Swiss-Prot record:
Record pathway: Alkaloid biosynthesis; ergot alkaloid biosynthesis
Enzyme Commission identifier(s): 1.1.1.332
Keyword DNA repair: no
Name under which the protein is recorded: Chanoclavine-I dehydrogenase easD
InterPro entries in the cross-refs: NAD(P)-bd_dom_sf, SDR_fam
Signal peptide: 1-20
Source organism per UniProt: Claviceps fusiformis
């Protein structure tokens, strides 16, 4: 029996991409309840249908949540515990991309203030608000194995003279995760981070708006030495970190796919 079987999980950004792949794998391994938060509701029905085909006994609860809103995040997580009585694990996957290759040197002078705030609001503040609220509700539950996984990026290891907001948000996400991990480990809560490389998700074309097709994007990255992974590859690492199989790993930042440059 899987160590996530019969347990309750929360997944931000869970309606598509890596988040949806994580939900499907949790269902495949017997999770009792998966609570999905996403600002985009259009994929909720298809996600629920796909999970029903994988495991009809897994309950999927989808909620529209803007992770950059403290109120949205707090209400969602408190609602999970109020309704289901527990929360064993959470994956904070919600995030947005930033287009590369649109700026000319000096690229820093073309970094837009509004885009900077928007990217950091979702990719960094959203992770902070979610992790803080998850720790708060988990702390008040009976002592048990509990795990939180945040999703950063290979950009956390990179020094690219472009996409400053995205790289900063992901580097800060990884740093934040390791600090929180050291803080809460003694409360029985493990916190870890996953940093995907180039991953085939709906966000991928948004990073390379000048490239017309997915095949061309894959070729571009392959020529730079970066193979393309699938969302399911990342999901396997997230679910492992959520499970008791990964005890006592905490404060880790695991790259999935391309290695750090």
């Amino acid at each position: 029996m899987s160590s996530v079987s019969a347990k309750i999980f929360a997944v931000t950004g869970g309606a598509s991409g890596i988040g949806a792949a994580t939900c499907r794998l949790l269902a495949e391994r017997g999770a009792a309840v998966i609570c999905v938060a996403d600002v985009n509701c259009t994929d909720f029905a298809s996600l629920q249908e796909s999970i029903a085909q994988i495991n009809a006994s897994t309950l999927v609860q989808c909620t529209k949540v803007d992770v950059s809103s403290v109120q949205d995040v707090n209400l969602w997580l408190h609602g999970i515990v109020s309704k289901h009585g527990d929360l064993h694990g959470a994956a904070n996957v919600a995030g947005i991309a930033q287009a590369a290759g649109l700026r000319t040197k000096l690229t820093i002078l073309e970094e837009d203030d509004a885009e900077w705030r928007r990217v950091l609001d979702i990719n960094l503040n959203g992770v902070f608000y979610s992790t803080r609220a998850e720790v708060k509700v988990m702390r008040d539950l009976p002592l048990a194995h509990r795990s939180i996984v945040n999703v950063a990026s290979i950009a956390a290891f990179s020094h690219v003279p472009d996409v400053y907001a995205y790289g900063t948000s992901k580097n800060a996400c990884a740093y934040l995760t390791t600090c929180i991990a050291a803080d809460v480990f003694w409360s029985g809560i493990r916190v870890n981070c996953v940093s995907p490389g180039i991953t085939n998700t709906p966000l991928l074309p948004q990073f390379e708006p000048k490239v017309k097709t997915l095949d061309e994007i894959r070729k571009l990255y392959r020529e730079q030495g970066y193979p393309t992974s699938e969302a399911e590859d990342v999901a396997r690492t997230i679910v492992w970190l959520l499970s008791e199989d990964s005890r006592p790993v905490y404060g880790a930042n695991i790259n999935v796919g391309a290695c750090p440059p």
